[in-house]
Amino acid sequence: MFKKRGRQTVLIAAVLAFFTASSPLLARTQGEPTQVQQKLAALEKQSGGRLGVALINTADRSQILYRGDERFAMCSTSKTMVAAAVLKQSETQHDILQQKMVIKKADLTNWNPVTEKYVDKEMTLAELSAATLQYSDNTAMNKLLEHLGGTSNVTAFARSIGDTTFRLDRKEPELNTAIPGDERDTTCPLAMAKSLHKLTLGDALAGAQRAQLVEWLKGNTTGGQSIRAGLPEGWVVGDKTGAGDYGTTNDIAVIWPEDRAPLILVTYFTQPQQDAKGRKDILAAAAKIVTEGL
C-alpha cells in the first residue's frame, strides 16, 4: 500500500489519471511492451516530453526499461560520477579527502548554497563532495573537477568501471543546456543504472568508499519531490537530482524497500521547449509505476 503524502500524492494521482490504453508506446527491442511500459508511454504522452526510465531489481537482476538506450542530458546527476572518482582516488591516497581547496569569489557560479559561505576560505574534498551531492552545489562540483584534472578524467573513470556510454564534456553550469540531439554531457538510463549499481552496491569502489558514497546520497536534500515522492513511506532512498534547459528534470536513486532487495532507478525527462518548467511530478509518477509493477 502507498501511504498518502498530501499534495504531492494528489499531484501524482492527477498525472496518472491521464493514462489511456491506446497511447502509442516505445517497445522494447524484443517482444511486446509490458503493462508497465504501456503506463510509462501513457505518462510520456500526457507530459508532452520524452521520458527515459531504467530500473534494476537486484533480487533477480531483472530490468524495467523505457527508452533505456536513448541518450539524455545528465545535468547534475553527473555529479555522482564526479564524487565517485574522488572516492576512488582515496582508496590509494588515504588522506586525500582531507585535502583542502580555496574557494574564491571568482569560482562562484549560479548555484552555490554551500560554497558561497566559504569565499576566501578552505573546504576539504570531503566537504566539497558532500556539498556537490547533497545540495547540488555547482561551485563544489567545479572545484572537484579542477582537482580531478577536468571532465575527461571523469569520463575515463566511468570507462574504468565498464561504462562506455557516460560522457562529461563541460563544467557547471554549461553542462545543463540539454539541447536536443547534443550528445555532450549525456548518458542513457540503463548505462547510468548499471554504473550506479556498481558504485553503490557493487565492487567499483572499496567498502569504505562505497559506504561513504551511499551516506552522501542518502543525505540528499533536493530529491523530496522526485523519485522519493513516488515511493511508499518507509522505503530508504539515496539519490541525486538534476535539472536544466528544455525542462530537463532528472533523478537517479538507489532504493531500499522494506523487506526486499535494493532497487536501482534512473528517471530522465526532457521537453521540446527551451524555457519549459521542470516536472518533478513526472519522475514521481514514473517511480510509482515501476515499483508498483514489480
Curated annotation (Swiss-Prot):
One of its GO terms (biological process) is beta-lactam antibiotic catabolic process. Gene3D superfamilies: DD-peptidase/beta-lactamase superfamily. The active site is at S76 (acyl-ester intermediate), E174 (proton acceptor). InterPro entries: Beta-lactam/transpept-like, Beta-lactam_cat, Beta-lactam_class-A, Beta-lactam_class-A_AS. The keyword Signal applies. Pfam families: Beta-lactamase2. SUPFAM superfamilies: beta-lactamase/transpeptidase-like. GO terms for molecular function: beta-lactamase activity. Substrate binds at K240, T241, G242. Residues 1-27 form the signal peptide. It comes from the Bacteria. The keyword Ribonucleoprotein does not apply. The class A beta-lactamase family has a specific amino-acid numbering system, sometimes called Ambler or ABL numbering and often misspelt as Amber. A multiple sequence alignment was used to derive a consensus sequence and then the consensus was numbered taking into account insertions and deletions. This allows use of identical numbers, e.g. for active site residues, despite differences in protein length. UniProt always uses natural numbering of residues, hence there appear to be differences in numbering between this entry and some papers. PANTHER family: BETA-LACTAMASE, BETA-LACTAMASE-TYPE TRANSPEPTIDASE FOLD CONTAINING PROTEIN. This is Beta-lactamase. It comes from Citrobacter koseri (Citrobacter diversus).
